Every structure is written in structure tokens, then in C-alpha cells.
């Protein structure tokens, strides 16, 4: 059995979606002064590797704590969408073999984490999102800043997926290892467990895959 960390590190100055709160992590208490070390965290609900609840794009849709835990864990299908150029659309053809469950889209864009190029990621088209919903997919993850283009005036892929009460995971990492494992015939299981934030639009996660 192999465990793969699919998360980016949470640290001061890390990349965030344009307009989101900047992240800072620093000491609130120290052993020298207070007898214990405690960190103070300042971050948004969409910081780092995180999940979006449907409420993220529509006030009428379920919030994070209203979703079943099954949305955040289970067997995953990994779609290899690597090799695309900046801001390339990922259409329905990429998901022709997908049937239900959790789908992770490996664009390879996590290699740009921390650089300006990270915002020029490939994205899901509205038609691709609609096909995933039609196929019964209720959790979609990407190794990019968003399932929609960045920046965006609208969020069509978000709206289609969230409208079906699907969960979206963004800023995943190391999906290439999952592509290799799946090609070798190994099962891929993932855990995308968010902080239990009441009434939230989303939350950071420690995303982990188990191969075997």
C-alpha cells in the first residue's frame, strides 16, 4: 500500500485566488514566553488545497456541513489531461469513459505552483461539467487553481457542478503519480476531508490517496 499526499503546503505568502484573503502563519504563543508553541492562522476558506461546497456559488445550495461525508472519500477515477497549453479548455471528450464516483483531473499544472504561470491553467468547459453530472459524478478534483478559467467573469463549470450538489476540490498536487498507478492497474482511493466549519462555502483539506 502506498499513500500519496495530494496537498500543497500552507504557509505565509502562498498563492491564493485573486481577491481571496492572503495567508499568514505565525507564532501566537511560544515555549520561551508562554510554555507552549501555538500558531496563529489567517486564511480564507478557499486557501491551499481545499473543497468547495455548492453554497460557494449560490446562497440557496447546501453548505459544507450539510453534505454527506461520502462526498469527500472513496474510489477515484483519474483523467490524464496533461500536456495541454495555458488556458486550454478540457471538453467532454476527456471524460468519455467516466462513470460516477470521484473524478480527479490531472492537468500537470501543479508544477507551476508558486509562479505566475499557475493562474494560466487549463479548465473544464461547461459541457464537460454537464457530462460529469449526467454520468453521476458528485466530486471533481483538479490540480489547478480552479475548474473555471482564472480570472473569470462567470463560473460556468462551478455552477453546473454545484447545481448538482457536487463537491469541487482545487489546488491538488501529485496527481501524476495517480495517473501512473491507475495505468498500472492499481485502485485509487482518496480522502478530501475538510475542516468542520459551520455554514461554510468550503474549507482547506489534507488530501491523501491510497494506491493498491
Locate each region found by the language model.
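Active-/binding-site microenvironments in catalytic and ligand-binding cores
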Residues: 1-212
Amino acid at each position: 500500500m502506498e499513500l500519496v499526499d495530494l496537498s500543497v503546503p500552507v504557509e505565509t505568502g502562498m498563492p491564493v485566488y485573486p481577491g481571496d484573503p492572503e495567508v499568514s502563519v505565525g507564532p501566537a504563543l511560544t515555549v520561551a514566553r508562554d510554555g507552549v508553541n501555538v500558531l496563529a492562522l489567517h486564511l480564507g476558506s478557499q486557501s491551499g488545497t481545499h473543497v468547495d461546497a455548492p453554497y460557494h456559488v449560490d446562497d440557496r445550495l447546501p453548505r459544507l456541513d450539510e453534505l454527506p461525508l461520502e462526498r469527500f472519500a472513496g474510489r477515484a477515477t483519474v483523467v490524464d489531461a496533461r500536456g495541454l497549453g495555458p488556458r486550454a479548455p478540457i471538453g467532454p471528450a476527456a471524460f468519455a469513459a467516466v462513470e460516477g464516483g470521484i473524478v480527479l483531473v490531472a492537468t500537470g499544472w501543479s508544477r507551476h505552483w508558486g509562479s505566475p504561470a499557475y493562474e494560466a491553467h487549463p479548465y473544464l468547459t461547461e459541457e464537460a461539467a454537464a457530462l460529469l453530472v449526467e454520468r453521476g459524478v458528485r466530486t471533481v478534483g483538479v490540480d489547478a487553481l480552479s475548474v473555471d478559467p482564472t480570472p473569470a467573469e462567470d463560473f460556468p463549470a462551478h455552477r453546473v457542478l454545484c447545481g448538482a450538489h457536487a463537491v469541487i476540490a482545487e489546488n491538488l498536487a501529485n496527481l501524476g503519480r495517480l495517473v501512473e498507478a491507475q495505468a498500472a492497474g492499481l485502485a485509487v482511493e482518496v480522502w478530501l476531508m475538510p475542516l468542520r466549519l459551520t455554514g461554510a462555502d468550503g474549507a482547506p483539506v489534507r488530501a491523501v490517496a491510497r494506491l493498491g
